[in-house]
């Protein structure tokens, strides 16, 4: 029995030490400590001994069992430590390696213009309004005094959307941000119903859509429109506000601006706003005018009491002039080489 016990301990220690993974180790455990293991068989043999020998050998077998279990636990810990060390080695960071630069994004040049326009007009008391890009035919055209036979209503100029709204009105992708002015004015009038109404001063930047595409036009473009309505707002106010805006936007005090008579259905009188460039050249930069009485009525205002002006400019046009870009399509191609210049 003594020889058997010593051999069991030696065999168990050798078997556990040879196990290179947990599955093998568990198999070896079963060989020595399982229901049919070597120690279990020795315990079964105690019944053949006399009481005194059974007591002595039982104590020795339990001592051997503890030695085997200790060897098993030590090997388990060794395997766990080896696995952890391997993981740490695989995930180790070499602090002597040079650092990796983090890719840095930047604001798109058109969005730079958008934010700059909001900041400039915000500094003189204009709110910023937002509205849906899918508009009703009424909001986009009728409310703005566009007649039913106006060319802008044709499918050659406007993207119409299948279906109608809850009032059975035609739906389309807005061709300008003027509908936002109408929506804002109507909410303003409703808000101050029955009490003194402060002037309406708002700009409406946003995406707009028209069936057009070339070096200076895109089927989707960004526009900002402004509206100022009050008891005594004149064309002189329009000239002062927009001229001041251009000088702040381009950071030049010597900018020359002219207002050239034009026609828009939603303003009367109307004017194109041109900005002077070198060699006596002028470039159209905005459309503007005094808000038409019919538009004021559609806003819920009395044209006999209220008067105001509106203007609209393309954000891409302003961006092209500010940065000297000659092709509108560059803004939409996602060319990192181009965009990186504005980072």
UniProtKB/Swiss-Prot annotation:
Origin organism is Cupriavidus metallidurans (strain ATCC 43123 / DSM 2839 / NBRC 102507 / CH34)
**EC number(s) recorded for this UniProt protein:** 6.1.1.20
* Record-stated family: Belongs to the class-II aminoacyl-tRNA synthetase family. Phe-tRNA synthetase alpha subunit type 1 subfamily.
Name of the protein in its database record: Phenylalanine--tRNA ligase alpha subunit
Matching entries from Gene3D superfamilies are given as: Bira Bifunctional Protein, Domain 2
Q: Which GO terms describe its molecular function?
A: ATP binding; magnesium ion binding; phenylalanine-tRNA ligase activity; tRNA binding
Compartmental location: Cytoplasm
Q: Which InterPro entries match?
A: aa-tRNA-synth_II (IPR006195), aa-tRNA-synth_II/BPL/LPL (IPR045864), Phe-tRNA-synth_IIc_asu (IPR004529), Phe-tRNA_ligase_II_N (IPR004188), Phe_tRNA_ligase_alpha1_bac (IPR022911), Phenylalanyl-tRNA_Synthase (IPR002319), tRNA-bd_arm (IPR010978)
Keyword Endoplasmic reticulum in the entry? The reply is no
How does this protein assemble?
A: Tetramer of two alpha and two beta subunits.
Which catalysed reactions does the entry list for this protein?
A: tRNA(Phe) + L-phenylalanine + ATP = L-phenylalanyl-tRNA(Phe) + AMP + diphosphate + H(+)
- Coiled coil located at which positions? none
């Amino acid at each position: 029995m003594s020889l058997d016990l010593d051999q069991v301990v030696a065999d168990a220690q050798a078997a556990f030490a040879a196990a290179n993974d947990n599955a093998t180790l568990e198999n070896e455990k079963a060989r020595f400590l399982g229901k049919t293991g070597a120690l279990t068989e020795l315990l079964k043999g105690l019944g053949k001994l006399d009481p005194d020998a059974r007591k002595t050998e039982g104590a020795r077998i339990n001592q051997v069992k503890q030695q085997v279990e200790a060897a098993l636990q030590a090997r388990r810990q060794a395997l766990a430590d080896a696995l952890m060390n391997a993981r740490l080695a695989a995930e180790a960071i070499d602090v002597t390696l040079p650092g990796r630069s983090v890719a840095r994004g930047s604001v798109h040049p058109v969005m730079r213009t958008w934010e700059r326009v909001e900041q400039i007009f915000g500094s003189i008391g204009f709110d910023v309004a937002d509205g849906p890009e899918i508009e009703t035919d009424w909001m986009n055209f009728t409310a703005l005094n566009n007649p039913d036979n106006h060319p802008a209503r044709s499918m050659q100029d406007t993207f119409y959307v299948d279906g109608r709204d809850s009032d059975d009105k035609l739906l389309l992708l807005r061709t300008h941000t003027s509908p936002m002015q109408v929506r804002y004015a109507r909410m303003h009038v409703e808000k101050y119903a029955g009490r003194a109404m402060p002037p309406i001063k708002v700009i409406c930047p946003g995406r707009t859509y028209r069936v057009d595409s070339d070096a200076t036009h895109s089927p989707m473009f960004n526009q900002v429109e402004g509206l100022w309505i009050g008891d005594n707002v004149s064309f002189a106010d329009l000239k002062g506000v927009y001229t001041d805006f251009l000088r702040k936007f381009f950071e030049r005090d010597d900018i020359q601006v002219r207002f050239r008579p034009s026609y828009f259905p939603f303003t009367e009188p109307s004017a194109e706003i041109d900005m002077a460039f070198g060699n006596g050249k002028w470039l159209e930069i905005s459309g503007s005018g005094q808000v038409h009485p019919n538009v004021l009525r559609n806003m819920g205002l009395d044209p006999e009491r209220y008067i105001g002006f509106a203007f609209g400019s393309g954000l891409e046009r302003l961006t092209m002039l500010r940065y000297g870009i000659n092709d509108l399509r560059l803004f939409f191609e996602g060319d990192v080489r181009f965009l990186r210049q504005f980072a």
